[in-house]
């Protein structure tokens, strides 16, 4: 799609993420989030990196008490971001979106501005202090997400917009199984140095899957069977995986309750915090849907081929219209991987995947030891017909009944 100006591209991208009657943008929570300047944070090692952004650990917080305090330099500090070409063209578009977030329609359609009251500003200051106190008392560990300084300069604009969009989503998605946004970078989200202050992830599901696979391998050895004849360790490992699958479904259920489509559910985007709780993160491909924009069959005309092919529903791979049930398909592949401890379609190249999975309805083999409920759950959720797929509310109920299914480890492989 061609745009005459950068601002036109801006506006398109914002409206592509949020409908005109956006529930997310209308929420005041974003405006109430505390802010930090980059000079107040000392960052450490790189924890993870995507195509556009990097996530770094926060090693120190040096809170400035007043805005007019001069920033103190610290030899430990690393520059958070320094793009030479600040994209001032984004300002008007960003301001327009920020204004929409602080407007409500009253009687007769009259638009009223919502202003931050003194109590709101006081609350933001208290929140800053709470964040610092929790960090200093070792009650919380944080990370920042920022635009990579090494990406193609032509992609910086898109990266900044994506990060600003993600901030909007996380501001309203306050749930135990979704990564927690704690604060945002001071200033305009479309300027250099903007960042998200997030709870730190301990590891990802990708890492946890490797750990489970190694544990499962050890349990299959003869000595393990002698030491654990009733298979209690197998049962515990199975229950741990089912419990994690339930938490993922609960987080996705909450996301869908806002009519948000996630579009990139995979092990790399599912983490575990320092206490072992599941956290869904990376909302760069998420979009808010408006039912008024849907087709007669309940689908939407959205960008195709979005996400990771291994977990991509057929309709999105075929560039057909789709809805949030593509997330349920992706979940079925993640669930199967958690149960089988093998990547789905691990030996398929792109052409084979397209011919056999997308067009041919080939699916992974379901293990015989799984219960009838789990077998049916997988088959329903990876059905080529999106209407056959269980909702996440239904998935939570189905899986909750499975947590104690294996009464004896002998029923497991």
Predicted regions and their residues:
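Conserved short submotifs of the Hanks-type protein kinase catalytic core
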Residues: 191-204
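Short beta-strand micro-motifs within the conserved protein kinase catalytic domain, predominantly
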Residues: 180-194
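Activation segment signature within eukaryotic-like protein kinase domains
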Residues: 244-245
